[in-house]
């Protein structure tokens, strides 16, 4: 399996990845198409496509910040789930050599409990601080999520940095923008 960065929004594989994204996440957790295109212009944003035998196997939309990698969206093609693809994507992301941060729904029903166990098996730990992800789209409110990180829980300073980066950089690409314009110039991606 290969994980490659896609910068071309017209690439047929990326268009299939966007279909997977729309099928895998509820509407309130998705960017609008123009916002997705804008995010792809940001050097810190990586639309990573997992390919197996030339076909789309999954995706990881992530942000490569100086001190950590933030996995904003991760999903696997439904017919390929349970075959270790998600684990391999996470293992490849770990090659960045810095902490990896992601968010999950609170483990309150079977699917979210299974999702938390999956990430724990992959070496992630739940952080105990309260976290509300801002809305991506008009008409929605922020939603409560659990922050997980690998290889350890985040320090107070790291939590504050994540909250700031989420508000000022990641959510810049939301409609309406949830943040002010950040400075540019982060280092190259994974």
What residue ranges belong to the model's regions?
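Short amphipathic alpha-helix that is part of the acyltransferase structural core
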Residues: 1-31, 35, 49, 145, ...
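Conserved catalytic-core motifs of GNAT/GCN5-like acyltransferases
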Residues: 103, 116, 120-140
């Amino acid at each position: 399996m290969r994980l490659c960065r896609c910068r071309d929004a017209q690439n047929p594989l990326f268009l299939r990845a966007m279909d997977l994204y729309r099928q895998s996440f509820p509407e309130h957790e998705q960017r609008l198409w123009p916002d997705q295109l804008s995010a792809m212009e940001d050097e810190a944003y990586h639309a990573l496509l997992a390919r197996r035998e030339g076909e789309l196997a999954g995706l990881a939309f992530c942000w490569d910040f100086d001190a950590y990698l933030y996995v904003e969206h991760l999903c696997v093609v439904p017919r390929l789930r349970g075959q270790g693809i998600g684990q391999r994507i996470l293992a490849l992301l770990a090659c960045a050599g810095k902490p990896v941060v992601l968010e999950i729904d609170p483990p309150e029903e079977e699917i979210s409990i299974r999702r938390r166990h999956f990430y724990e098996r992959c070496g992630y730990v739940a952080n105990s601080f309260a976290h509300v992800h801002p809305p991506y789209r008009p008409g929605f409110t922020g939603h409560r999520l659990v922050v997980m990180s690998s290889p350890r829980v985040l320090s107070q300073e790291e939590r504050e940095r994540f909250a700031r980066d989420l508000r000022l950089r990641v959510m810049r690409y939301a409609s309406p923008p949830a943040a002010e314009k950040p400075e540019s110039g982060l280092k190259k991606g994974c």
